[in-house]
C-alpha cells in the first residue's frame, strides 16, 4: 500500500495531493510497539485526540527508529487535518526532550538568572530577514543570557543557522562548547539537528509529505538548555494560545507566543500582533500594535530579506559598529520590538517601552554587536581547538 493510499484510508482525504512512496525504515519486533502504533493511528485517524501518554508513546516510536515512513506520514497527516491539542504537543515534546542532547550552562543557573530563547516555528513564508536571530544578540547585549534554538532553512530562503554561518559563527560545536558560549559570551546557538539527532528518523517522511507539520510547532517547545523565558513566533494565530499553554505545562516560567496580523511569525511593526502571554502558570491573549512599543508602523515590504549573505548584511547594519553605519529604520524597529518582548519575558524589562529602551541602548552602545563578534570569535576558537586536539 502506498503512503498516499494509507493517508487516504486513514483520514478520508488526500493530503495536499501528495504522492509519497512507502519505504520502511525497519521491522518492528516488539508486539507492544506494534499494538501501540496501530491503536494510536486508528484513534487519530478517526479524528480523536490522543492523551499525553499516547502522544509521548507515538513520538517515542518515531525517535527510537521503529516507525516506518508510512506510519509517520499517517500520523503527521492525521494531525494536520485534525489539529493538535495541548496534551498532544506536551506528549510529543516530552519524548523529544527525553531524546535530546542536553546543554548545561552553569553560571546563569548558579546565579539564578533567566535563560531566554527566541526560537519560533518558522514557516510564515513572508521572506523577511532573520528578526529573532538579530533580536537574540540585542537581548544578550542587554545582559540577559540567550540559548538560541534554531535550524537551517526549511520553508524560507534563510534559517537562523544559515545566517549565523554567514555572520561567522560556527554552529557545529559540541554540547560542552555551546554551554561555554552561553556561560562566557552570554549567548549560544543550539543547532536543532545536532541537539535532536533522533528526529532524523522522521525527516524522509516529512520531506515526502511536504508542508508544515507538528515538528514545526515542537521546535520552540524543546529547547535543549531548558530556557525559562521565551518569545516564540508562530505561523498561524490559532496556535498562539495552544503553544503558550504547552510551554507552561513544560515548565517555562514566562513566554510571549506571537503572530503578526500581516502573517509574520514575529511581533509585527505593520499593524496588530496577536499575543498569548504565559505568566505565573496562566495564559491570557490580547493584541499589541507598534505604537505600544513607541515605534512607527512600516509595511511588510520594508523588512524583507534574501539569502543568508543578504540577511547577514542587514543584521550588520542593524547592529552596526558605529552610528554612521548603523541603520535607523524598519529593520532596526522590528528587531527592537522583538528584543523588547524577550527582555520583558526575562524580567529584565518592566514593560514594552522599557524593553525598547533597553534594546536601543544595547544596539547604540555597541553591546549587541560586541556579543555577535564575541560569539563568532569564540565559536571559531573552540571549534578549532577541538579539531586540533589529539
Model features per residue range: what roles?
Residues 33-46:
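Charged, compositionally biased N-terminal leader segments and the immediate start
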Residues 14-19:
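N-terminal basic, low-structured, amphipathic or hydrophobic segments
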Residues 120, 124-173, 177-181:
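A generic, well-ordered mixed alpha/beta core segment in the N-terminal half of proteins
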Residues 85-147:
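Active-site cofactor/substrate anionic-group-binding motifs, chiefly glycine-
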Amino acid at each position: 500500500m502506498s503512503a498516499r493510499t494509507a493517508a487516504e484510508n486513514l483520514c478520508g482525504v488526500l493530503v495536499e495531493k501528495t504522492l509519497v512512496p512507502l519505504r520502511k525504515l525497519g521491522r518492528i519486533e516488539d508486539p507492544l510497539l506494534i499494538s501501540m502504533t496501530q491503536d494510536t493511528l486508528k484513534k487519530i485517524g478517526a479524528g480523536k485526540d490522543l492523551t499525553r501518554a499516547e502522544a509521548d508513546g507515538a513520538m517515542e516510536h518515531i525517535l527510537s527508529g521503529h516507525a516506518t515512513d508510512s506510519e509517520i506520514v499517517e500520523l503527521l497527516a492525521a494531525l494536520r487535518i485534525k489539529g493538535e491539542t495541548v496534551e498532544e504537543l506536551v506528549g510529543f515534546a516530552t519524548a523529544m526532550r527525553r531524546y535530546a542532547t542536553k546543554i548545561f550552562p552553569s553560571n546563569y543557573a548558579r546565579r539564578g538568572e533567566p535563560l531566554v530563547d527566541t526560537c519560533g516555528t518558522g514557516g510564515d513564508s513572508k521572506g523577511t530577514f532573520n528578526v529573532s536571530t538579530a533580536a537574540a544578540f540585542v537581548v544578550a547585549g542587554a545582559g540577559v543570557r540567550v540559548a538560541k534554538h534554531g535550524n537551517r532553512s526549511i520553508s524560507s530562503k534563510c534559517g537562523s543557522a544559515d545566517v549565523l554561518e554567514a555572520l561567522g559563527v560556527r554552529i557545529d560545536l559540541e554540547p560542552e562548547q555551546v554551554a561555554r558560549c552561553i556561560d562566557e559570551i552570554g549567548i549560544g546557538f543550539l543547532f536543532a539537528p545536532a541537539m535532536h539527532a533522533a528526529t532524523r528518523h522522521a525527516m524522509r517522511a516529512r520531506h515526502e509529505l511536504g508542508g508544515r507539520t507538528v515538528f514545526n510547532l515542537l521546535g520552540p517547545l524543546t529547547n535543549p538548555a531548558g530556557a525559562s523565558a521565551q518569545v516564540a513566533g508562530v505561523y498561524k494565530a490559532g496556535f498562539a494560545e495552544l503553544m503558550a499553554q504547552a510551554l507552561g505545562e513544560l515548565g517555562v516560567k514566562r513566554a510571549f507566543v506571537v503572530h503578526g496580523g500581516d502573517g509574520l511569525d514575529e511581533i509585527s511593526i505593520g499593524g496588530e500582533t496577536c499575543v498569548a502571554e504565559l505568566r505565573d502558570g496562566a495564559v491570557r491573549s490580547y493584541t499589541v500594535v507598534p505604537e505600544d512599543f513607541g515605534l512607527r508602523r512600516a509595511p511588510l515590504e520594508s523588512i524583507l530579506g534574501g539569502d543568508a549573505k543578504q540577511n547577514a548584511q542587514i543584521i550588520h547594519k542593524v547592529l552596526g559598529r558605529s552610528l554612521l553605519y548603523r541603520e535607523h529604520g524598519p529593520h532596526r524597529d522590528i528587531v527592537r520590538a522583538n528584543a523588547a518582548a524577550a527582555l520583558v519575558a526575562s524580567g529584565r524589562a518592566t514593560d514594552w517601552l522599557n524593553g525598547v529602551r533597553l534594546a536601543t541602548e544595547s544596539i547604540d552602545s555597541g553591546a549587541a554587536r560586541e556579543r555577535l563578534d564575541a560569539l563568532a570569535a569564540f565559536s571559531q576558537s573552540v571549534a578549532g581547538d577541538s579539531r586540533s586536539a589529539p
